[in-house]
A protein has these predicted regions:
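Long amphipathic alpha-helical segments
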Residues: 1-36
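C-terminal regulatory/effector modules of DNA-binding transcriptional regulators
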Residues: 21-22, 28-161
Length: 161
């Protein structure tokens, strides 16, 4: 649905305000669904931090990931949009996640996607970093040892199962 919505917007078949309205409705539904899930419980739970890097605003896919993870009894901390590496470092010091997940759909203005991936790997050597999004999939990026590129929803679902 979201891909069709984006395609309609790109081809001028709908107005940006219509796409924004639909995105807000979907966001609200996802937030309610996430809140209705029980808080993960048990020993040795996997812990994820989800976030969007600086300049990223397309959060529906990350919210969907939040829902998928929490529905599988996985602890999730969603930091939100426009998160700097420094802020992410502070959050990781406090929460000590096993995994970091983000999506990179917009082109970075200040640095290359490869440079950003390398910084993530260097700054968070103890976490498994999971990346997806158009900019990561469409470009030939080199994934360091602790970085995994998720090319599809099927790959993502297999990883969280």
């Amino acid at each position: 649905f979201l891909e069709k919505l984006s395609l309609l917007w790109l081809t001028g078949s709908i107005y940006p305000v219509q796409e924004s309205f639909m995105s807000c409705l979907i966001r609200q539904k996802l937030m309610v669904a996430i809140e209705q899930l029980p808080f993960p419980s048990g020993k040795n739970l996997r812990k994820f931090i989800l976030y969007l890097p600086e300049g990223e605003r397309q959060e529906l896919s990350v919210l969907f990931m939040h829902y998928l993870l929490k529905s599988r009894n996985i602890q999730v901390i969603y930091l939100g949009q426009d998160i700097s590496i420094n802020d992410l470092r502070d959050a990781c010091k406090f929460h000590q996640p096993h995994y970091l997940f983000t999506m990179i759909t917009e082109a970075f203005a200040r640095e290359s996607v490869q440079s950003y991936i390398d910084k993530l790997s260097e700054n968070f050597p103890d976490a498994q970093i999971l990346l997806s999004g158009y900019q990561v999939i469409a470009q030939p990026v080199q994934a360091p040892h602790n970085v995994r590129i998720l090319n599809s929803l099927d790959q993502t679902l297999a990883m969280v199962s």
